[in-house]
Amino acid sequence: MGFGKIVETSPFDHDSIIAYTSQLAHVVSSAYVKSPTMQKELGFSAGSFKDMTRVATLNETMWTTLFMSNRDCLVFEIDELIKHLTEYRDAIADNNSDTLEQLLKDGRILKEEEI
């Protein structure tokens, strides 16, 4: 299948991890492409745009079933993302470059530690 190793976990931990590592990305991608700016992206987009939109091309029937069967974990992750996006939004709206830079730094460090 291409997976590097088998991991044993509880059903709840599995569902929580899948909500975060897979399902949330599909929700975010689907929501992201709904921006009215999407119609104007031609000629301006590159790798980041392609990365963000790749999984928006999905089987909506299958993913609806998967999302609904894991709704508690997925709603938790969506709420977490909204909380963090609000922090970024507020820093930008308030013209608070120090807070924004710290938020970006925190994200970079978390990603680097994960690798």
Give the positions of each predicted feature.
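A structural signal for well-ordered alpha-helices, especially hydrophobic packing surfaces
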Residues: 28, 85, 89, 111-115
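Internal alpha-helical scaffold of NAD(P)-dependent oxidoreductase catalytic cores
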Residues: 1-54
